[in-house]
Amino acid sequence: MSNQPFLQARTNVPAFRLCGLLLAVLIASVPDASGQIFTWTREQMIRYTAQNPYERFPDGRPKVPDSLLEKVKDLSAEEVLVIAGRGYPNQFADGWQILHPGKKLVGRALTVQFMPVRTDVADVQAAEWKEKGGGRLSHQTAIDMLQPGDVFVADLFGSIPTGGIIGDNLAYYIWKTTGAGFVIDGAIRDLEGISLFDMAGYFRAATPPAIHNVMVAGINIPVRIGNATVMPGDVVLGDREGVYFIPPHLVKEVVDAAEITHIHDEWTRMKFNEGKYKSSEIYGSPRDPALIKEYQDYLKTKLGAERYEEYMKKKSPPR
């Protein structure tokens, strides 16, 4: 079923959200931000993602390597929780409807923010976008920017009455373009059709009407998804519990820590399978010196001597 034209009806709208106010303050405070209501310049993108250690897309968005994204697919939400201790406690969003609960979503965030439509603002936005050489400003403006490995992340302020931002045709385009999927803090439509696609998707509800009564406020800018702050280029990890948005500079650290966890879990279950120990003797960590040594030897074998020594140095830095 085709998605209907992007409407700007002058009817009652949901309350203006605090995130929009904060975004307006943020954009107003950025030097040389005039005319950049829709997206950051490359320089601004680099400034706000300065800790990114990887390559970038032409627009400045961080480009975490595909090889690292493959490793993220082996992670669970619990294994990403370590970023909370690194100053990022607001990177997880839950309470979703999940398109295919057994299929993980991994990719780089391309963000788009919407607000309840206000005609005078929308008219100026559309005119400025046209002056920059853009076409009709709509949700498809952001969708057409997607690259392989991207995740379409849409901040629709959790609204359901404003209709479904994508139906089966646009969902199919997202799937075939990115190979990943979408996170939509709002509604989708054509769920029966979308469910036939082998893609990952997270959304709040499904509803028949097409999107209306909203306007694009920004593309590839910070957005709020649930209780998470999402930056363009964040690595998206969705599993059965919810969605994590991982800052690029922490991705490798998370992956490395998860490898240790996997090895520990493997050893723990091996010991449980022996049927000789109470759970508290093995999990969370063994206390018996012989078992401690056995685990350390197992870890060293799995990691290799060099990586094991590096891990132990980080775990117990010299005083």
Each predicted region: which residue ranges?
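Boundary at the C-terminal end of the N-terminal hydrophobic targeting segment
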Residues: 33-35
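N-terminal secretory signal peptides that target proteins for export/translocation
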Residues: 1-15
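Amphipathic alpha-helical packing elements
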Residues: 40, 45-73, 79-80
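Buried hydrophobic positions in well-ordered alpha/beta secondary-structure cores of metabolic enzymes
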Residues: 60, 174, 234-236
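Feature captures the catalytic cores and cofactor-binding loops of soluble hydro-lyases/lyases
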Residues: 72-79, 83-232, 246-294, 299-319
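Bacterial N-terminal signal peptides
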Residues: 17-29
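Channel- or pocket-lining gating/hinge segments that regulate access to a cavity or pore
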Residues: 241-244
